Regions:
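Formylglycine-dependent sulfatase
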Residues: 1-179
């Protein structure tokens, strides 16, 4: 990392904000590039696969016949990591897991300035959605489209929960949301 490249997390942390990262991280984890090295006080990211096991009864999967999709599905186990620590398996669908953790960050930091960078995996491949969300898409044609739409439904639910939490805590009016 060049010293003249400053992240928004570094700027806000220097200004007294608590900074948290939840989700995808595409800058790498070596040589000063991890979220904690880039200005985040705390970071929760998935370090293995980004989806529940294929045979999980609560989800529906959709696959594409492409080399990248095959590689992603074969890439490893569902595992998260907090601040570079040991890997652990989240107990639910990734969009819901990220959302629940984001709600905790908001709740725990409501009385001080905070910056939450929530980078959902949805609607990225591999395509996986909760069975309950896919069932709501029965009016659509095509298995992959139903699963993709189920992922959008979960993402929409996530944004709704976050906005609702901000309103419940009476901090919505002084919050900037970038989506």
């Amino acid at each position: 990392k060049r010293q003249d490249q400053i992240t928004i997390a570094e700027m806000l942390k220097d200004a007294g904000y608590y900074t948290a990262h939840i989700g995808k991280w595409h800058l790498g984890h070596s040589n000063g590039m991890s979220p904690n090295d880039q200005g985040f006080d705390d970071s929760l990211s998935l370090g293995g696969s980004y989806y529940l096991p294929e045979n999980d009864p609560n989800v529906v999967n959709a696959k594409f016949d492409t080399s990248i999709d095959k590689m992603i599905w074969a890439s490893g186990q569902y595992a998260a990591q907090f601040n570079g620590g040991d890997y652990f398996a989240p107990d639910k669908y990734v969009t819901d897991y990220y959302t629940d953790e984001a709600l905790k960050v908001i709740e725990n930091n409501q009385h001080r300035p905070f910056f939450l960078y929530l980078s959902h995996w949805a609607i990225h491949n591999p395509l996986q959605a909760l069975r309950s969300d896919v069932k709501e898409m029965n009016h659509m044609r095509g298995h992959n489209l139903k699963v993709y739409s189920g992922m959008i439904r979960a993402l929409d639910r996530s944004v709704g929960k976050i906005v609702e939490k901000l309103k419940d805590l009476d901090i919505y009016g002084k919050t900037l949301i970038i989506f």
